[in-house]
Amino acid sequence: MSGAFPISTSKFETLGIKSVQNTIISKSISGKKLARQVDNQRFGFTARIITAKRSDVYGELMAFIMKQRSGKENFTIIPPARGNVSGTVLVNGVHAVGDTTIDIDGMTGTLKAGDFIKFASHNKVYMVVADATADGSNEATITIEPPLITALTNDSVVTYDNVPFTVHLINDIQEFGTVGADKDGNVLYQFELDVEETL
């Protein structure tokens, strides 16, 4: 792995999140549909970095992107969160591969539909697909997608804030473009990258 995306200096101007899951669909003459998924779901991002001077952002960012050696290396990237959860959130009970409802405890607040979570036992990131608010005992049941790809044990830690995605670049050519100059004549750079989750 080749480090973490330099989020401290390279702020996102735009961030588009996509879900990638190859599905084969066949339709009969009568209109019936047969669908089969042929691999695991993974997330992808298209991110545009704020326009800035090389000394402010782009020197460090260019060096980081070069270290990735195209798509060879993996790195982590953290998108913003939506919910207002606090506490040390843990898995409550044992959950099998394929489960989509997970019991948790130690939580206060609400996980919002669209929030990302990650379990300590593996790198896959999951999306919460329905709001889940902790009850008076700090417990909740969350519904996630995709289904679990690795079983969970009781008291596994759930990461809900600053969830790191392990990703790789999906394009072999990375281009840093200039988009003009500021009022002092400093060249301004812009960069857009496409990444996909590494499972």
Put a short name on every predicted segment:
Residues M1-L199:
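Extracellular/virion structural assembly segments
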